[in-house]
């Protein structure tokens, strides 16, 4: 079967609802492992096994875990889902996340990711931006390690421009 042709999408019953299994290629820019990690996080909140979660409960749980402070980007995505007012399934949850992040292989998607780093609107990624993202992701990197990353990635040695970031993201290693 060619890459353009896809097998019919299988449906599995989940409680009284139907859940559609999507293939990883349905989410450009996400690997199968990344989709699986997102699914595991979603399932933590699907305590009744219905395949659906209430965004209000998800937001409250994330807030109680400090996500509004530790990872405001993800928290705000969940808060936007809350405005819909109905339970969401995994595909809706994944759509919300991927629409915010975009396709990491397109310039537009890479620009969206850049904007997640550039929270101060300086149109560059500086040491403070890297420290914040490192903390949000739970990484334990020293200021020296982050400064070295900047030095290597930035064409001027101080901060990463949008163009520097794009070049880093599209660089392929073999």
Swiss-Prot record:
GO terms under cellular component: cytoplasm; cytoskeleton
InterPro entries: CALM/Myosin/TropC-like, EF-hand-dom_pair, EF_hand_dom
Gene3D superfamilies in the cross-refs: EF-hand
Pfam family, one: EF-hand_6
SUPFAM superfamilies tied to this protein: EF-hand
Coiled-coil ranges per UniProt: none
Protein name as annotated: Caltractin ICL1e
Gene name of this polypeptide: Icl1e
């Amino acid at each position: 079967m060619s890459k353009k042709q896809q097998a019919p999408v299988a449906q599995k019953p989940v409680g009284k609802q139907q859940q559609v299994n999507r293939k990883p290629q349905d989410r450009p820019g996400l690997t199968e492992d990344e989709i699986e990690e997102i699914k595991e996080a979603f399932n933590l909140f699907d305590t009744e096994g219905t395949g659906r979660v209430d965004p209000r409960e998800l937001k409250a749980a994330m807030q109680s875990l400090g996500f509004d402070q530790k990872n405001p980007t993800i928290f705000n995505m969940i808060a936007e889902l809350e405005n819909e007012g109905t339970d969401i399934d995994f595909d809706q949850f994944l759509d919300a996340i991927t629409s915010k992040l975009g396709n990491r292989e397109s310039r537009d998607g890479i620009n969206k990711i850049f904007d997640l780093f550039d929270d101060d609107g300086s149109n560059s990624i500086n040491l403070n931006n890297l420290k914040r993202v490192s903390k949000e992701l739970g990484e334990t990197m020293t200021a020296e390690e982050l400064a070295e990353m900047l030095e290597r990635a930035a064409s001027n040695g101080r901060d990463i421009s949008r163009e520097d970031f794009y070049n880093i993201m599209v660089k392929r290693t073999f």
